[in-house]
Protein backbone atom coordinates (compact mmCIF):
# COMPACT_ATOMS: atom_id res chain seq x y z
CA UNK A 1 0.00 0.00 0.00
CA UNK A 2 2.98 2.30 0.52
CA UNK A 3 4.51 1.76 -2.91
CA UNK A 4 4.97 4.95 -4.94
CA UNK A 5 2.26 5.71 -7.46
CA UNK A 6 2.95 5.85 -11.17
CA UNK A 7 3.06 9.32 -12.62
CA UNK A 8 0.06 10.27 -14.77
CA UNK A 9 2.21 10.31 -17.91
CA UNK A 10 3.60 6.81 -17.34
CA UNK A 11 0.24 5.27 -16.57
CA UNK A 12 -1.48 6.96 -19.50
CA UNK A 13 0.98 5.36 -21.92
CA UNK A 14 0.53 1.89 -20.43
CA UNK A 15 -3.14 1.59 -19.56
CA UNK A 16 -6.47 3.20 -20.45
CA UNK A 17 -8.08 5.43 -17.81
CA UNK A 18 -9.40 3.64 -14.74
CA UNK A 19 -13.18 4.06 -14.37
CA UNK A 20 -14.35 4.01 -10.76
CA UNK A 21 -18.08 3.80 -10.07
CA UNK A 22 -19.40 5.11 -6.76
CA UNK A 23 -22.93 4.04 -5.80
CA UNK A 24 -25.18 3.91 -2.78
CA UNK A 25 -28.48 5.12 -1.30
CA UNK A 26 -29.44 8.78 -1.09
CA UNK A 27 -27.58 10.56 1.71
CA UNK A 28 -25.04 7.81 2.35
CA UNK A 29 -22.08 10.02 1.50
CA UNK A 30 -21.30 9.31 -2.17
CA UNK A 31 -20.65 12.92 -3.09
CA UNK A 32 -18.61 13.51 0.06
CA UNK A 33 -16.50 10.44 -0.73
CA UNK A 34 -15.96 11.65 -4.28
CA UNK A 35 -14.92 15.07 -3.01
CA UNK A 36 -12.44 13.58 -0.55
CA UNK A 37 -10.98 11.21 -3.14
CA UNK A 38 -10.48 14.02 -5.63
CA UNK A 39 -8.75 16.19 -3.05
CA UNK A 40 -6.56 13.30 -1.87
CA UNK A 41 -5.54 12.12 -5.35
CA UNK A 42 -5.50 15.16 -7.62
CA UNK A 43 -1.84 16.02 -6.99
CA UNK A 44 -0.70 12.58 -8.21
CA UNK A 45 -3.24 11.72 -10.85
CA UNK A 46 -5.09 13.37 -13.72
CA UNK A 47 -8.74 13.16 -12.62
CA UNK A 48 -12.18 13.83 -14.08
CA UNK A 49 -15.57 13.22 -12.45
CA UNK A 50 -19.10 12.56 -13.68
CA UNK A 51 -22.11 12.89 -11.39
CA UNK A 52 -25.65 11.59 -11.88
CA UNK A 53 -28.85 13.24 -10.67
CA UNK A 54 -32.39 12.62 -11.90
CA UNK A 55 -33.55 16.16 -12.65
CA UNK A 56 -30.72 18.48 -11.59
CA UNK A 57 -26.94 18.79 -11.57
CA UNK A 58 -26.77 19.41 -7.84
CA UNK A 59 -23.90 17.03 -7.11
CA UNK A 60 -21.85 18.63 -9.87
CA UNK A 61 -22.50 22.00 -8.26
CA UNK A 62 -21.57 20.75 -4.78
CA UNK A 63 -18.26 19.32 -5.99
CA UNK A 64 -17.47 22.51 -7.87
CA UNK A 65 -18.24 24.73 -4.87
CA UNK A 66 -16.14 22.44 -2.66
CA UNK A 67 -13.20 22.83 -5.03
CA UNK A 68 -12.83 19.08 -5.53
CA UNK A 69 -11.58 19.64 -9.08
CA UNK A 70 -11.59 22.53 -11.55
CA UNK A 71 -15.10 23.16 -12.85
CA UNK A 72 -14.34 21.93 -16.35
CA UNK A 73 -13.29 18.54 -14.99
CA UNK A 74 -16.70 17.82 -13.40
CA UNK A 75 -19.66 16.90 -15.60
CA UNK A 76 -23.21 16.56 -14.36
CA UNK A 77 -25.59 14.11 -16.04
CA UNK A 78 -29.37 14.42 -15.69
CA UNK A 79 -30.66 10.87 -16.03
CA UNK A 80 -34.34 11.84 -16.12
CA UNK A 81 -35.42 8.50 -14.69
CA UNK A 82 -34.47 5.59 -12.46
CA UNK A 83 -30.85 6.08 -11.34
CA UNK A 84 -29.79 2.45 -11.69
CA UNK A 85 -30.95 2.30 -15.32
CA UNK A 86 -28.39 4.96 -16.26
CA UNK A 87 -25.51 2.96 -14.79
CA UNK A 88 -26.62 -0.58 -15.62
CA UNK A 89 -29.42 -1.49 -18.04
CA UNK A 90 -28.86 1.47 -20.37
CA UNK A 91 -25.60 3.18 -19.47
CA UNK A 92 -25.36 4.99 -22.81
CA UNK A 93 -25.83 8.45 -21.31
CA UNK A 94 -22.91 7.86 -18.96
CA UNK A 95 -20.75 6.14 -21.57
CA UNK A 96 -21.25 9.20 -23.76
CA UNK A 97 -20.29 11.45 -20.84
CA UNK A 98 -17.10 9.43 -20.29
CA UNK A 99 -16.22 9.77 -23.98
CA UNK A 100 -16.82 13.52 -23.88
CA UNK A 101 -14.65 13.99 -20.82
CA UNK A 102 -11.84 11.88 -22.24
CA UNK A 103 -11.95 13.84 -25.49
CA UNK A 104 -11.34 16.97 -23.42
CA UNK A 105 -8.79 15.36 -21.10
CA UNK A 106 -7.14 12.51 -23.05
CA UNK A 107 -4.40 12.07 -20.44
CA UNK A 108 -6.85 11.36 -17.61
CA UNK A 109 -5.77 8.56 -15.29
CA UNK A 110 -9.07 8.10 -13.44
CA UNK A 111 -12.70 8.78 -14.35
CA UNK A 112 -14.94 8.83 -11.28
CA UNK A 113 -18.62 8.12 -11.97
CA UNK A 114 -21.05 8.82 -9.14
CA UNK A 115 -24.48 7.28 -9.53
CA UNK A 116 -27.69 8.89 -8.42
CA UNK A 117 -29.01 7.72 -5.04
CA UNK A 118 -30.60 4.30 -5.32
CA UNK A 119 -31.46 1.13 -3.43
CA UNK A 120 -29.28 -1.81 -2.43
CA UNK A 121 -29.88 -3.55 -5.76
CA UNK A 122 -28.05 -0.98 -7.89
CA UNK A 123 -24.90 -2.08 -9.71
CA UNK A 124 -22.69 -0.63 -12.43
CA UNK A 125 -22.44 -2.09 -15.91
CA UNK A 126 -18.96 -3.58 -16.49
CA UNK A 127 -18.88 -1.51 -19.68
CA UNK A 128 -19.04 1.64 -17.56
CA UNK A 129 -16.98 0.86 -14.45
CA UNK A 130 -13.75 -1.07 -13.86
CA UNK A 131 -14.02 -0.79 -10.07
CA UNK A 132 -17.17 -0.28 -8.01
CA UNK A 133 -17.37 1.31 -4.58
CA UNK A 134 -20.67 1.08 -2.74
CA UNK A 135 -21.44 3.46 0.14
CA UNK A 136 -23.90 2.80 2.96
CA UNK A 137 -24.18 4.69 6.23
CA UNK A 138 -24.57 3.84 9.88
CA UNK A 139 -27.59 6.13 10.21
CA UNK A 140 -29.59 3.52 8.32
CA UNK A 141 -29.12 1.14 11.25
CA UNK A 142 -26.81 -1.76 11.98
CA UNK A 143 -29.10 -4.11 10.01
CA UNK A 144 -28.14 -2.62 6.62
CA UNK A 145 -25.19 -4.96 5.82
CA UNK A 146 -27.25 -8.10 6.40
CA UNK A 147 -30.00 -6.89 4.08
CA UNK A 148 -27.68 -7.83 1.24
CA UNK A 149 -28.22 -6.78 -2.34
CA UNK A 150 -25.58 -6.58 -5.10
CA UNK A 151 -24.19 -3.28 -3.86
CA UNK A 152 -23.34 -4.81 -0.50
CA UNK A 153 -22.34 -8.30 -1.59
CA UNK A 154 -20.72 -7.78 -5.00
CA UNK A 155 -19.11 -4.33 -5.03
CA UNK A 156 -15.32 -4.29 -5.16
CA UNK A 157 -15.24 -2.17 -1.99
CA UNK A 158 -17.99 -1.49 0.55
CA UNK A 159 -17.73 1.77 2.47
CA UNK A 160 -19.67 1.96 5.74
CA UNK A 161 -19.84 5.69 6.38
CA UNK A 162 -20.84 7.96 9.28
CA UNK A 163 -19.37 5.77 12.01
CA UNK A 164 -19.50 8.78 14.31
CA UNK A 165 -23.30 8.50 14.36
CA UNK A 166 -23.32 4.96 15.77
CA UNK A 167 -23.94 6.02 19.40
CA UNK A 168 -26.72 8.36 18.33
CA UNK A 169 -28.69 5.74 16.40
CA UNK A 170 -27.91 2.78 18.64
CA UNK A 171 -25.85 0.98 16.01
CA UNK A 172 -23.16 -1.48 17.06
CA UNK A 173 -20.17 -1.17 14.72
CA UNK A 174 -18.85 -4.59 15.74
CA UNK A 175 -22.15 -6.17 14.68
CA UNK A 176 -22.04 -4.28 11.38
CA UNK A 177 -18.48 -5.47 10.76
CA UNK A 178 -19.39 -9.08 11.56
CA UNK A 179 -22.45 -9.01 9.31
CA UNK A 180 -20.44 -7.38 6.53
CA UNK A 181 -17.85 -10.17 6.63
CA UNK A 182 -20.61 -12.77 6.46
CA UNK A 183 -22.24 -11.09 3.47
CA UNK A 184 -19.06 -10.25 1.56
CA UNK A 185 -16.70 -13.10 2.34
CA UNK A 186 -13.20 -12.03 1.34
CA UNK A 187 -14.30 -8.84 -0.40
CA UNK A 188 -12.92 -5.77 1.40
CA UNK A 189 -14.80 -3.09 3.30
CA UNK A 190 -13.82 0.16 5.02
CA UNK A 191 -15.51 1.97 7.89
CA UNK A 192 -15.34 5.73 7.50
CA UNK A 193 -16.23 9.07 8.97
CA UNK A 194 -15.66 11.04 5.79
CA UNK A 195 -16.31 14.44 7.32
CA UNK A 196 -13.30 13.83 9.60
CA UNK A 197 -11.32 12.13 6.78
CA UNK A 198 -11.28 8.87 8.75
CA UNK A 199 -10.83 5.98 6.32
CA UNK A 200 -10.20 8.09 3.21
CA UNK A 201 -6.59 6.92 2.96
CA UNK A 202 -7.80 3.31 3.01
CA UNK A 203 -10.12 3.93 0.08
CA UNK A 204 -7.34 5.66 -1.85
CA UNK A 205 -5.00 2.73 -1.17
CA UNK A 206 -7.65 0.30 -2.43
CA UNK A 207 -8.11 2.24 -5.67
CA UNK A 208 -4.37 2.44 -6.23
CA UNK A 209 -3.81 -1.26 -5.60
CA UNK A 210 -6.81 -2.70 -7.43
CA UNK A 211 -6.61 -0.13 -10.21
CA UNK A 212 -2.96 -0.98 -10.92
CA UNK A 213 -1.88 2.53 -10.02
CA UNK A 214 1.04 1.35 -7.87
CA UNK A 215 4.36 -0.22 -8.77
Swiss-Prot record:
It holds the Pfam family cobW. One of its GO terms (cellular component) is cytoplasm. The keyword Heme does not apply. Keywords: Chaperone, Cytoplasm, GTP-binding, Nickel insertion, Nucleotide-binding. GTP binds at residues 24-31. One of its GO terms (molecular function) is GTPase activity. It is found in: Cytoplasm. GO terms for biological process: urea catabolic process. It comes from the Bacteria. Belongs to the SIMIBI class G3E GTPase family. UreG subfamily. Homodimer. UreD, UreF and UreG form a complex that acts as a GTP-hydrolysis-dependent molecular chaperone, activating the urease apoprotein by helping to assemble the nickel containing metallocenter of UreC. The UreE protein probably delivers the nickel. Facilitates the functional incorporation of the urease nickel metallocenter. This process requires GTP hydrolysis, probably effectuated by UreG. This is Urease accessory protein UreG. The gene is ureG.
Amino acid sequence: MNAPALSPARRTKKLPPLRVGIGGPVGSGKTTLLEMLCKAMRERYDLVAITNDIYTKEDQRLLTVAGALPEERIMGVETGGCPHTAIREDASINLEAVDRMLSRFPDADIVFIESGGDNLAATFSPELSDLTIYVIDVAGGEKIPRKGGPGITKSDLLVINKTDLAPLVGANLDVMASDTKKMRGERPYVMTNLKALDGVADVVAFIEKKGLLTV
